[in-house]
Amino acid sequence: MESVMEAQSPLAEDGFSQVTRKGGRRAKKRQAEQPSTQEEGGDATCMDTEEARPAKRPVFPPLSGDGFLSGKEETRKIPVPANRYTPLKENWLKIFTPIVEHLGLQIRFNLKSRNVEIRTCKETKDVSALTKAADFVKAFILGFQVEDALALIRLDDLFLESFEITDVKPLKGDHLSRAIGRIAGKGGKTKFTIENVTRTRIVLADVKVHILGSFQNIKMARTAICNLILGNPPSKVYGNIRAVASRAADRF
């Protein structure tokens, strides 16, 4: 049993002495918990009197190129196929101007390795500049116009997606040629219609299809192209993508 001790309090009232019970471990534990609960109650009353302040979101400044790279240079190399040498040479001024002036990067075309090389330097301020420049050059190499590819530098929510027609349906010979013709349409009418409705840009290079746009728009354009490959008539595909586009416009 726990030992019980009696102690007289100096503040006695009416001639009666106040008796406090002191026990063993349990009593000491209760006495230690009482002050902490009193402090919590006092803090709660103080907090009730104060006005509730909304929590502020932490603001982190963007990383600078110098602090992130810490003196190390990063490089990206984009191979250039033979059929894109002439367009690259003709549009070289339009390509390197935004990369050098706006992104603060260094760019060159290596004649030996046939690669476009981009690297960071002291003037690079944005950490994502190298990735944006590489995507911009890659989009031009795939066949997009310089004006369309520039959107990859200006906007953050644009992406590139590539797939092959044979990934959707294993076609060969004349069947593959007809599938390519259904995607393009007479004079490119079908391709232009899909681009305008889905707000994307499409490049049809042999059996490869490249789509430039936002995630949701790429999904709509890819669905329409896959339906054409599988044999759906263009009129039905037009109706489907217009319905999906109108629902997306109403939602936003």
From Swiss-Prot:
Pfam family, one: KH_PNO1_2nd
Alphabetized UniProt keyword annotations: Acetylation, Nucleus, RNA-binding
Family annotation (SMART domains): KH
Stretch list, region Disordered: 1-66
Highest taxon of source: Eukaryota
N-acetylmethionine, modified sites: 1
Major localisation: nucleus
GO molecular function: RNA binding
GO BP, sorted A to Z: ribosomal small subunit biogenesis
A GO cellular component entry from the record: nucleus
Subcellular location: Nucleus, Nucleolus
Residue ranges annotated for the KH domain, each copy included: 173-225
Record note on quaternary structure: Part of the small subunit (SSU) processome, composed of more than 70 proteins and the RNA chaperone small nucleolar RNA (snoRNA) U3.
Similarity remark: Belongs to the PNO1 family.
PANTHER family assigned: RIBONUCLEASE Y, RNA-BINDING PROTEIN PNO1
Purpose: Part of the small subunit (SSU) processome, first precursor of the small eukaryotic ribosomal subunit. During the assembly of the SSU processome in the nucleolus, many ribosome biogenesis factors, an RNA chaperone and ribosomal proteins associate with the nascent pre-rRNA and work in concert to generate RNA folding, modifications, rearrangements and cleavage as well as targeted degradation of pre-ribosomal RNA by the RNA exosome. Positively regulates dimethylation of two adjacent adenosines in the loop of a conserved hairpin near the 3'-end of 18S rRNA.
Protein name listed in UniProt: RNA-binding protein PNO1
Native species: Bos taurus
UniProt lineage: Eukaryota, Metazoa, Chordata, Craniata, Vertebrata
